[in-house]
């Protein structure tokens, strides 16, 4: 097993250019595929999730050209759905941002497809999306356990009509449905069952669809209407914003041990909800400065917060480890969907926080963190989850430092993370 030792860091300062957003990269690749014309995507994220999407698109006959550093992709759109004359099996690793949209997109055309992934992917639910696609006439079946990949799709096109989809587990199901709806045979009316989680991620989807020329009627996130007969048209160029969830670690570093840390590639013009992480740091006492495409975080004495963080589920994880350096008990609420991510993040976070001495209360959909008088060093298990590894790098600001087990799991979104993190140390 690989281990990375992070020695205590007394002060951080510097500037980090954030790699492209995973959410935006994979959405934009799929829309560019379905669109008419050639799209040039810049600042594309170079990571496992994106590589699985690109490999699948290539297997399905999509033509694209990647720059040497894999961050610029020129992709020739199909001006319509993906088709396959022979049966295709696509392996998608643990990439939810590839599995869910492709599952929906492959119901639009003609062909037989099997979607598989790593063992953890077989534990990540997809039933709500499959139920919705079946309501629109899709033929999707489970190859192992009901409600989970691997999946088999026999596609002859998507009918359209009225569809209900649960909104309380993952916004990725709705995102997948929205992106394919314009290419259905009839209008699609989507009714949301329950409270929609992670609304800002839906805003990303709608903003990108608009960039590719498709209009969606959003009725206050309770229902959505997508008219048939629309088509995606390439805007020519798409700049992928920096990943706001990835920015959270550097902003937290500035708040805990700054100095001044500036992240570029995200800012007040960002379409990602996770930039609101900076507002949480501000509530904890950090000094935050916003530009159109940058955020600056400066250190201060931090105090605990008690907040509903459903709108920033990924970045909220960083608050759990930042809480180790704040006075009082921090409560992070309404985060049930942590449990269905790369690992059960609520259980994993509670376990690892206790290792360093924190007093933790883990509930069904919340976590409370009280720092100890003195933090202990530990070897942190990362559960093949990139965000666990990056969150616990904050422990480098304790006097004891920290050891991260299997740090290479950051390759899912940020292969160069620890080099960038160490570049801020002074």
Swiss-Prot record:
Its main location: cytoplasm. SUPFAM superfamilies: EPT/RTPC-like. One of its GO terms (molecular function) is 3-phosphoshikimate 1-carboxyvinyltransferase activity. HAMAP family: EPSP_synth (MF_00210). The keyword Electron transport does not apply. GO terms for biological process: amino acid biosynthetic process; aromatic amino acid family biosynthetic process; chorismate biosynthetic process. It comes from Shewanella pealeana (strain ATCC 700345 / ANG-SQ1). This is 3-phosphoshikimate 1-carboxyvinyltransferase. Pathway: Metabolic intermediate biosynthesis; chorismate biosynthesis; chorismate from D-erythrose 4-phosphate and phosphoenolpyruvate: step 6/7. It is an enzyme of class 2 (transferase). Belongs to the EPSP synthase family. The active site is at residue 314. Pfam families: EPSP_synthase. Its EC number is 2.5.1.19.
């Amino acid at each position: 097993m690989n281990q990375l030792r992070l020695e205590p860091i007394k002060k951080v300062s510097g500037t980090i250019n954030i790699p492209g957003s995973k959410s935006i990269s994979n959405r934009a690749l799929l829309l560019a595929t379905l669109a008419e014309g050639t799209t040039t995507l810049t600042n594309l994220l170079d990571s496992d999730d994106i590589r699985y999407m690109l490999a699948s698109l290539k297997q399905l006959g999509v033509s694209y050209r990647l720059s040497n550093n894999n961050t610029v992709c020129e992709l020739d759109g199909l001006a319509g759905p993906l088709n396959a004359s022979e049966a295709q099996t696509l392996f998608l690793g643990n990439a939810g941002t590839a599995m869910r949209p492709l599952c929906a997109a492959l119901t639009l055309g003609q062909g037989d497809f099997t979607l598989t992934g790593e063992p953890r992917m077989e534990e990540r639910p997809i039933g709500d999306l499959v139920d919705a696609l079946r309501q629109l006439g899709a033929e999707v079946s489970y190859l192992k356990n009901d409600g989970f990949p691997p999946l088999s799709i026999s596609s002859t096109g998507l009918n359209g009509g009225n569809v209900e989809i649960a909104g309380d587990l993952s916004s990725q199901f709705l995102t997948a449905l929205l992106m394919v709806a314009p290419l259905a045979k009839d209008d699609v009316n989507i009714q949301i069952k329950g409270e929609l989680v992670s609304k800002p991620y839906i805003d990303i989807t709608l903003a990108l669809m608009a960039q590719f020329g498709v209009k969606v009627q959003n009725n206050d996130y309770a229902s959505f209407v997508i008219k048939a007969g629309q088509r995606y048209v390439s805007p020519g160029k798409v700049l992928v914003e920096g990943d706001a969830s990835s920015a959270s670690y550097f902003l937290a570093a500035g708040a805990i041990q700054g100095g001044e840390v500036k992240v570029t590639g995200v800012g007040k013009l960002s379409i990602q909800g996770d930039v609101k992480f900076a507002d949480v740091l501000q509530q904890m006492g950090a000094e935050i400065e916003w530009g159109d495409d940058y955020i600056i975080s400066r250190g201060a004495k931090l105090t605990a917060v008690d907040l509903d963080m459903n709108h920033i589920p990924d970045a909220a994880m960083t608050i759990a480890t930042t809480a180790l350096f704040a006075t009082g008990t921090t409560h992070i609420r309404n985060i049930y969907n942590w449990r269905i991510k790369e690992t059960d993040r609520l259980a994993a976070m509670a376990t690892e926080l206790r290792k360093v001495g924190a007093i933790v209360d883990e509930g069904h959909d919340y976590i409370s963190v009280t720092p100890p008088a003195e933090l202990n060093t530990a070897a942190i298990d990362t559960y093949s989850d990139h965000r666990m590894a990056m969150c616990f790098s904050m422990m480098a600001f304790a006097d004891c430092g920290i050891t991260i087990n299997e740090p290479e799991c950051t390759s899912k979104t940020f292969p160069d993370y620890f080099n960038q993190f160490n570049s801020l140390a002074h």
